[in-house]
Amino acid sequence: MDVKNLTKKYDGKTVVDSVSFEIPKGKVTSLIGPNGAGKSTVMGVISRLIARDGGSVNFESQDISKWKSKELAKRLAILTQTNNIQMKLTIRELVTFGRFPYSGGHNTAEDEAIIDKAIAYMELQDIQDQFIDELSGGQRQRAYIAMVIAQDTEYVLLDEPTNNLDIYHASNMMKIVRRLCDELGKTVILVLHEINYAAFYSDYICAFVDGKIKKFGTVEEVMTKENLAQIYKVDFEIMEIEGKPLSIYY
């Protein structure tokens, strides 16, 4: 995925300003930055949920606007911050939605097998008949990830997947993100506020400030106290844990 000179305005105000970057295939790339930096807007544009005002997003050598929705949904899955489905659904029924681009709602035995596999991968077999609105936040997020796995796309876009989760469930969610890449071969792009999760679980980090890219590179290249101080306007210290540069800020 190649983004060039991407621009987005709201009410005349530029919120994404001529942004260009390329997403490394088969890796985890985290978008970080302060509130209002443009991270989620960029995510919305590259997933085609938000219309752009300028620039291009090339996906498999074709601008993303030219893809038919059904074909794009076989290659790219998006999980937004808010996933409030206004229906009484069980976990299995939710995960079944992941097969819609392929089956159109008429699942084959192969579709059902893929659904079974996705539910098992997220260890939801024992509660697959429970309703989504009866689950804990962590269980619900795992159910949505199972739906994404059932969609069987090469690219997975996650907008703040740890939002509203406690430390235990948030860290488990990040382990799942890592597994999507390492075990299932996905290219994962996610928006994160917790920079230490980005540092520990990502391969690359793209840091935004005021609608522009401040720094893009490997975790080691981005996670310096000088870079982070420029991005967040607070003081940082960097320490290494398990070979990863993690930050202390105050």
Model-based region annotation:
Residues 47:
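Helix-to-loop junction immediately C-terminal to a conserved catalytic motif
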Residues 55-63, 72:
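Conserved ABC transporter NBD signature motif
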Residues 96, 109-127, 152:
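Conserved ABC ATPase "signature" region
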Residues 131-135, 139:
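Conserved ABC ATPase signature
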